[in-house]
């Protein structure tokens, strides 16, 4: 193990908790991995800092917003940093499916804290996004490792979205009893409505979105990971980095905003190598709704959003094999 503490920059609280829990399973010392984010109170943050200074902590997970706080920058300047890992690195690119402006501040902060090797990781990056990541992180001479997007164990299907969509989903889930699955909806309102409909039809389902209180959100996530809950109905706030190997189906209630986002979300199925079914419900109305959402955003952002959306629509409307398209 390298000397010092590695800083892992991660975008979501749920993702940090999941990964810290996993790391602690490999060690008798809970202090080996910690996270700093807005969910911690002052005494918890003081404990984290104490473990780092004592040399116990090998991995520190932080959100970009926490990393840029002056008090955290000042503290980390006095810590030996072994390396920086930028997780979900596609968030740095305007061409990525989940652009987050705060990711653009990572390189200047690294320079301020103290230079160390940098690794950037993502499961979904087009050539344009990869170039953007390297440019923004100052990694022009980086060594690049790529693997195929193709997951032969996943079955992709696009269905027409009709007024009977809820009934179609209930029928599908009941034909696959006890199997773990995720259903993605674009709006929080629809997430809660659909979770209630599924529960009323005897399906062990729960909702998950960023607007819920953190205790309920965490309980629902943990219940899903521990097999107490079969189906999670969620916005895209759920799932990034959640490593549950036996998810058997991923359903998109609405068309995704980009193909990269779609790949990332469907990629949560079949991680154990077993079969995974990926079903998307598509209607032209959804397309119009998403285009409407983009109005009022900066022109450059609108143009990128429209291009990504057109690629997704072309995939949904294609008559050839989904894997080829």
Model regions and ranges:
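Helicase motor core with emphasis on the C-terminal RecA-like subdomain
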Residues: 1-4, 10, 17-300, 304-307
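Cys/His-rich short segments
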Residues: 304-325
